[in-house]
Every structure is written in C-alpha cells, then in structure tokens.
Amino acid sequence: MNTDFPCADRKVIVALDFDDRRAAEELVERLGDACGFYKIGLELLTAAGPGLARDLVERGHEVFLDLKLFEIPNSVAGAVRAAGALGASMVTVHGMGGTGIMSAAVEAAREFPRLRVLALTVVTSMTAGDLADIGIEADTEEQVLRLARLAVGAGCDGVIASPREAGVLRELLGPDRLIVTPGVTLGPDVPAGGAAGGSAGGSVGGPAGGPVGGSAGGHARAGTPQAAFAAGASHVVVGRSIARAADPVAALRRARAAGNSCG
C-alpha cells in the first residue's frame, strides 16, 4: 500500500467536469502552475479519450482517474493497468463490487508503484432512501464504514466518501490511508463568473460543515474544504467552485489554505 501523503499544494484536486477537451484545457491553462492535481471522470474520458490524461502527466501534473470501476475482476484489473500505463496517480473502484473486485484492482496496481487504488464507498448523491431502494437497510454512514472495512481488507490505499464521513473514517482507518472527499464547495463568497459551488453549494454552518442554502450540485452529502480537512480528509475534490470562479487561481488558493491550516 502506498501511504505517502500529499504535499500541501496537492491536497486539492480540481475536477475537470467538462464534456469536451477544449473546455478542460482552458481551465488547466488558466490555473497554470498553481494546480498540480486534476480529476478526470467518465464524462470527459468518454468525450476526449485518454490523451488528455497522458498529456497532463507529461506536463508534471498528477491525475486522478475517477472511473468507479464495477465489473468482473479481470476487466477491472485490465482497466487499472491501463490507468497505470497512462501515468495516473489515483483510480477508483466501486466498494459495492466486493472484495474480489477491489483485490483484483490492488493486485493490478502493483505494476505501477505511483498508482493508488481508492474504493468508492457511497456516492455523494445517495441518501439512506436511495440505499433502501436497492435493498440496503443501513444508513449512509453505516454503509460507508462497512465498505471501508472491506477496502482495508482488500489492500486499497484509501477510500472515497463525502466530507460528512471523513471524521469517522479517519478514526476507523488510522493515519495512513487516504480519504478523498468530493462534494466540496468553497462557499458563496467565491467571486464567480457563473454559479459557484458545482461540487456543492453554500457555506460553513450546515450539518457537518455542509452547505447552508444554495445548490447542492447533485451532492446530497456536501461540505466545505475546511470541514473535510479538519475531520481528517487527505484530499478534497473541488469542481465548479474553482472552474466557474472569476479568478480560478484565487479560488484554488482558498481551498488550499484550508488544507494548510489543518496540517
């Protein structure tokens, strides 16, 4: 297991949640040397192909491929090896796929010492009601912890969960494993060229540092970088709060300051 923690300027991962490569590259250009870590999800990967990820790595950036792999173990292993060959630093596998899928991902990643396998616990858009719809009686926190335990047993480097579960996960996982939290907003005071908050909207003060007012951006369990880092997150993923800010570099610095203040 790779237990290296990020340097301060790479605790904040900027989500390239775009549907074409040109828009993603425009944000990368605006951020310049200020950003060292980007997330590429299924939308951009499908629209732009793997070339952007490779190019970002070649420029010295780290890349988080958020693939949420949930397939037969052989297919998951193949996808993880492909992510490693691109030079990715992180790749996600669905914890709900069980130990077999996660173990296959971990084994495949051994060929790539820099690649960290993270288990997605419960997607940040899901609530207890959504879990009940698929026959899971546990609430979201219980399910997150259950899947985190499975991830530890499978040898994953860390987990993906909302900011609201970062504290209980740090208690469970100890100091070494990574806890990466999407669903993060900088709050309404970010100067925005459009709707701020995409990853989540609002400011400190809601439950577990969640948003007070504003759009949740599709995340039912959102939070701020301050709350996430204070609770024990190793990284936060920030999307539209940076991408749609009038000054993306200033917005990124605000998010990074939250990580620096938490050590």
Residue positions per predicted region:
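Conserved beta-strand positions in the central sheet of alpha/beta enzyme cores
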Residues: 13, 36-39, 64, 89-92, ...
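Structural motif
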Residues: 33, 59, 86, 112, ...
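C-terminal helical cap(s) of enzyme catalytic domains, especially alpha/beta-barrels
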Residues: 102-108, 229-231, 242-263
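Conserved, mostly hydrophobic/aromatic
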Residues: 14, 38, 68, 91, ...
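Conserved anion-binding
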Residues: 6-10, 71, 75-158, 162-167, ...
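Conserved alpha/beta-domain cores
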Residues: 16-63, 73-79, 149, 163
